[in-house]
Amino acid sequence: MNFSGVFAPIPTPFVDDELDLGALRDNLARWMETDLAGIVVLGTNGESAQVNDNEADELIATARSAMPESRLVIAGTGRESTRATVTATRRAADAGADASFVSTCGAGWASAWELV
């Protein structure tokens, strides 16, 4: 797998608080006209905290089906625990993600002193 090139962190489109998979397909069609190496779906700006597991699966599967196999789909799978992250990463692979992007836990457990 080649991770060279530009990978766009994409926003997740919604309409009336529901996923807008048609808009996602339209956006991907436009982005695939460029030289992007791939996309990051549900990354740090992809609203991953606002979607449930089934919606995440739908987003990843829709992205994979709307893109050529030569372009990579990287899925944001970082969660608040190791167990949940492993589960999300496996689900992402099953939905068609080529790789995962795991960010660390968002909970602020460190004190100000520990951060200095």
What are these regions (language model features)?
Residues M1-V116:
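Active-site beta->alpha loop and helix N-cap motifs at the rims of alpha/beta catalytic domains
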